[in-house]
Amino acid sequence: VRVAQPQRLTLRLIGSAAVAFGVFLSGFVIDEPAPYELWMAGLVGLWFILGLKISRTTAPLLALLLTFNIGGMLSLTQMRDLATGPMYIAVSTFLALTSIFYAAIIEDSHKRLPLIFNAWSFAAVITSMLGILGYFHAFPGSEVFTLYDRAKGAFQDPNVFGPFLVPPALYLVHGILAGNLRTLPIKAGALLILALGIFLSFSRAAWGLFAVTVLILIFIMLLKERSGAFRLRVLILSLGAIILMAASLVVALQVPKVSELFSARAQLVQQYDGEHLGRFDRHRIGFQMMMERPLGIGPLVFGTMFPEDEHNIWLKSLTTYGWLGFVSYVGMLCWTLTLGFRNMLLDRPWQPFLMVAWISVLGHATIGNVIDIDHWRHVYLLFGIVWGCAALEVRHRRSARSQPLEKFGKGAKFRA
């Protein structure tokens, strides 16, 4: 046993490092299959072979996501051409398995949460810097990190790049407001890079997601901590951060190229949103059409019938996964938000990570009304974090109940 124990500890460290590296790779998706898919496919497969445990708490996530993808498989029967459909559902199933994987390894050890968020933050800073440098054409060939004069970092789409940066930005905001002041300059610098990357993505969804989730985070922190000194610190640092970001925005807007694109993108409703067969018209027609198609129409078919894809996660669930998939996805999302909300204010070592993940899930569900988040890798990571933390809470309560019984059994004396 003495020999086996160090070996087990070494294997756990290697496993945790492999997970952190996988999360880091999620920030670099220029082409598909991306390095993230290749790495995580091997990692998830190996971990399952070695005996990954799925507890009763995380089993509903597995059941709902598998049912969601069964709906996708049924929708394939409605397609005339199966050229791209099966691969799309295969990717969906793989992403579902990554979510289960993250939930299970977090339940196994909450110490993996800092590794996950630090790796995510590191990847976010690097990909954000690539987007910023590309936007300003800092070196030859840097335009590969932009699309339509919008920063996209090491992603294919600015609308995915921007939201990817938001959860690590929230993590940094929490670290600035509640962490050690010695690390404040480093965290503030990293946050500024992420904020600039989000801004230069010119994604209205990312802008709204960042602004609203930061406000929700600050509100919940003020609600949880009742210390007057802590609340004063949060308010002062929040005010300082707002002033710094506002000043950075003013400086960025002095660049004519930035100012022009900002003026165009800052409009709440663009021409392609409100015109005939625009975004909102397609939503209306699509929902009406899906009321008559219980099995959906198949992956990527909607874009061949209309000028663009669904750009709505609820409509996407109906078209690509049918009624079964839609009910499963909505049920999974509601369950995720309920679990997180119920445990979010408890004083636990994993509470900050749960809070950031829950707020991010809520924000992504909201922007899902105007954008498709179906194949966003980081969204499945967020699902896994919330469910993993919920499983940690169940295990914590079970342990707390058993300890008094053990003490009572050892120390109690009965008289006849």
Name each model feature, range by range.
Residues V1-K53, N69-M79, H364-T366, L381:
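N-terminal signal-anchor transmembrane segment
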Residues R2, L43-V44, M73, P114-T146, ...:
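Alpha-helical transmembrane segments of multi-pass inner-membrane proteins
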Residues A4-L13, F48-A63, G175-G189, E225-L237, ...:
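Membrane-interface helix-loop-helix junctions at transmembrane boundaries of multi-pass membrane enzymes
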Residues G15-G22, A124, L192, F341-V370, ...:
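Loop-to-helix entry and N-terminal half of a specific, functionally important transmembrane alpha helix
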Residues M40-W47, V214-L215, M355-A365, I373-A416:
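Transmembrane alpha-helices of multi-pass inner-membrane enzymes
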Residues P60-G72, L82-I105, L115-A124, P167:
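Aromatic-anchored transmembrane helix interface
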Residues G141, F145-L147, L268-L324, F341-L345:
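Long extracytoplasmic/lumenal interhelical loops at the membrane interface
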Residues M221-Q270, R284-M291, F414-R415:
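A membrane-periplasm/extracellular boundary helix in multi-pass inner-membrane enzymes
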